[in-house]
């Protein structure tokens, strides 16, 4: 964001996209972001000031100097910080408003929703020593290539498959950290389907009768390097969950690379890698609730390959919008800082494709 973009016609259009001046004033008062107008005269001025600080990377002093120079408002850097800390709920409401305006669309009757998370470091030294993070949990929707949901937490909140509300009929794609049986059951109960990557020892594999299912033995005996069969996974709360196991043997080159990465990770973490892990590295393993009658194994594998699109979504957030670790150590200021970047991403999404050299989803593999 540049100073000009806060002053020209783009700013007027931004206000309109956020519901107009009257709606912004109402939401600012409802969330107590704006209570009086002695210095900062209107919520519109407050929003302009907060976005200039969060997106302009000027710092508090430079932002207030800029605001004074253009005749926007004359306040101290301390006063700006105070107002910023009151804006978290307001900015969250505005992000929600933009998300609601573009409710997910369907693709061939089904919404494809990719779950993932990204993080930015906390600013203070103690947090950095303790790997302190702000974590942004997201749902990235296809074919619209838009973020459909955001949830902001710190490093104490882990990635969870059901953290983002389910849109009935969606197909939820997620990596192996989301192989969480009880949370998978929650998504299915709310009307979604799942395609989740699996590791050989992430869960307790079972047969229909409750006996243990030896996944590695099944991989060893797979015909033509493929598996497509029912499987059950044990749950902590409730009966075992029936899913569909799909596995395909990797190419020699891909398998060798996977084994190399597994050995390197074991060396880094200081443990002896098992032969079972090396054997499983030769395979790409998924579980899904999609039926074979509706989706072939090739269809399911093709769906999962779409996960690379969310990486481009996070690229937009960090390179195009410029999100990095927020300054300061206080959650009350870090939260609005991150929300301001999410707000700007949503405002720019209709035109952001023109800024990138990546192909559109419709032309992707």
What are these regions (language model features)?
Residues 104, 113-115:
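Short glycine- and basic-residue-enriched patches
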Residues 62-69:
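Short alpha-helical "recognition helix" segments of helix-turn-helix
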Residues 90-104:
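Short Lys/Arg-enriched helix C-cap and helix-to-coil transition segments
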Residues 1-57, 65, 74-75, 79-87, ...:
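Single, function-defining residue in the core of a domain
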